[in-house]
Regions:
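NAD(P)-dependent Rossmann-like dehydrogenase/reductase catalytic/cofactor-binding core
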Residues: 30-90
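Membrane-interface starts of transmembrane alpha-helices
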Residues: 25-29
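Active-site-proximal catalytic alpha-helix in oxidoreductases
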Residues: 1-20, 31-44, 63
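Short, surface-exposed linear patches
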Residues: 21-23, 82
Length: 90
């Protein structure tokens, strides 16, 4: 559905903005984010694992990944995505 594409693009936009906020150039940040999203999709398509199983493979206790994921969850990432999906159906 086109709304799903827009939601995914909103994540891409936010991640690019984050890269710029960290001091990178917009063009480089966009290339990194697009390759990251492409890699995640290809990984899930190739092995059929649940996304959480793949997240667990790249997450270590106290590491950068878990710290970032925890911050996103504390800010309501999953809830915001679910609420957005539901709002689109009202």
């Amino acid at each position: 559905a086109s709304c799903g594409i827009a939601y995914a693009m909103r994540y891409v936009r936010a991640a690019v903005e984050g890269g710029v906020d960290l001091g990178g150039s917009g063009m480089i940040a966009e290339k990194i984010v697009l390759q990251t999203v492409k890699g995640a999709v290809e990984l899930l398509q190739a092995n059929g694992n649940h996304p959480e199983a793949e997240i667990d493979k790249v997450t270590t206790p106290g590491g950068v990944t878990i710290k970032g994921l925890n911050e996103m969850e504390h800010a309501g990432f999953t809830s915001a995505v679910i609420r957005g999906l539901k709002a689109g159906l009202k």
